A protein has these predicted regions:
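Active-site metal-binding core of divalent-cation-utilizing nuclease and nuclease-like domains
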Residues: 11-16, 300, 305-330
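Phosphate-binding site recognition
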Residues: 1-289, 304-307
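Conserved catalytic cores of phosphodiester-cleaving nucleases, focusing on short active-site segments
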Residues: 297, 321-325, 333-341, 355
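Mg2+/Mn2+-dependent nuclease catalytic core
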Residues: 41-47, 341-358
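Switch/connector loops and helix/strand junctions flanking conserved nucleotide-binding motifs
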Residues: 30-32, 73-79, 345-348, 378-385
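Domain-level recognition of nuclease-like catalytic cores that cleave nucleotide substrates
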Residues: 360, 366-391
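Metal-dependent nuclease catalytic cores in nucleic-acid-processing enzymes
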Residues: 50-58, 208-216, 298-303, 351-371
């Protein structure tokens, strides 16, 4: 390795008695874009080691500050770059408040420029590091500057950045992606990732990369990952289409139409759509008979998440799935959905009325849409009934 740079640093320090500060942006770009060029990556690692670990050179340096995406690669022996203190999306203590915009900063910007904080919060909130809520600065600033919440994430990276790691599948990853799309959290062992993009050999490794890329957020205490906000959820939807994961993408893409037809009481459309979605969703996922009921209902009405806070009752052991759609505003009426195996739509509607589902609506007074769905295990068909009531 040619140590010309190192020698130059030593000579300058010796002559001028000045110490150096290095600021390196995207320090990991070679590892990310040339990951299979082992020779180049090794040469780059050696360059960094000679610059910053050599005792002769390090005595001439006050600070090295490098920013990037990937953590430092782990080696079978002691890391050649172990002289750095790392802060990443798994653990940024004690500088987490500088990783993104904190909530008080976002509120301040909204007040200054007369923007709707609740709308920005809905689109961009979700990253939490050591209890501190963080927002993506680019997305927040763009939305305030343009006075419109939109997907500004895709202006900074290509969709392949996401799909490359979603495409790893050992039979579990599709199930996990489906789970986080529905707003749930998935267990992940981040220690299985060796910080090496050439060694993505498990769903845990793939998920950990997505955490470092900010497509997933990470809860260190619970050791779970999740999609942080609405903007990133839209990125995953684009990725599903790009990957041609029809078994998930088709039900999601049809969910807006299903929601609209449900409000119209079009039971024929509801039954037909649920039948098709059951065929799509029952096969690929590691779900038992009862669990798949909830998945079908939630994905079938996926687009409604934009307008509703969806609460579900854990009733899978009873062979049914119960969901309460609580609107964020007064423009949408509440919707209560129950799906039950080997029943009738009338019986399901009666059961909705008997249960205390309406408690989740608080002091709401007005129209409520009830959707009762029965699933026949013999015919593999759905039958539905829609009823509008007044509270």
């Amino acid at each position: 390795m040619d140590n010309t740079i190192s020698k130059a640093i030593i000579r300058i320090n010796s002559k001028l008695n000045e110490r150096f500060i290095f600021l390196i942006d995207e320090w990991d770009v070679i590892y990310r874009e040339q990951e299979y060029n082992t020779k180049l990556c090794d040469e780059y690692t050696e360059l960094l080691r000679n610059l910053f670990k050599s005792s002769n050179v390090s005595s001439c340096i006050d600070l090295v500050y490098m920013t990037g995406i990937l953590p430092i690669r782990r080696y079978s022996t002691q890391s050649t770059l172990n002289m750095f203190t790392e802060y990443n999306m798994l653990d940024s203590f004690p500088i987490e408040s500088y990783v993104g915009l904190i909530e008080t900063e976002v509120i301040g910007l909204c007040n200054k420029y007369n923007r709707d904080f609740n709308e920005i919060k809905k689109w961009y909130k979700g990253y939490i590091l050591n209890g501190i809520s963080l927002y993506n600065p680019i997305s927040v600033v763009e939305s305030i500057f343009r006075n419109e919440c939109d997907e500004y994430w895709n202006k900074t990276s290509s969709i392949e950045t996401l799909t490359d790691y979603m495409n790893y599948d050992n039979g579990k990853l599709k199930d996990i992606i489906c789970k986080v799309l529905l707003g749930e959290k998935a267990k992940v062992n981040v220690r299985k990732f060796e910080n090496d993009l050439t060694k993505v050999n498990s769903s845990d490794s793939a998920l950990t990369i997505l955490i470092h890329l900010d497509y997933l957020a990470y809860d260190k205490k619970l050791k779970v990952c999740y999609i942080p906000n609405y903007e990133i959820k839209k990125e995953f939807e684009r990725a599903l289409k790009k990957l041609n994961w029809k078994e998930i993408y088709n039900p999601i893409s049809n969910s807006k139409k299903l929601y609209e037809e449900t409000l119209k009481g079009n039971v024929e459309f509801i039954n037909k759509t649920l039948d098709e979605n059951h065929k799509d969703l029952a096969g690929p996922f590691n779900k038992n008979k009862e669990d798949i009921l909830g998945v079908i209902v939630e994905i079938s009405y996926y687009s409604a998440k934009q307008f509703y806070n969806i609460k579900k009752e854990d009733t899978s052991i009873l062979g049914r799935s119960d969901l309460s759609f609580i609107p964020y505003d007064n423009c949408h009426i509440p919707l209560i959905v129950e799906l039950k195996v080997n029943s009738t739509p009338d019986e399901v509607i009666a059961q909705i009325k008997e249960k205390s589902y309406f408690n989740s609506l608080g002091n709401y007074h007005g129209k409520v849409s009830l959707l009762g769905i029965s699933y026949d295990e013999k015919t593999l068909k759905h039958n539905s009934k829609v009823l509008i009531i007044e509270l």
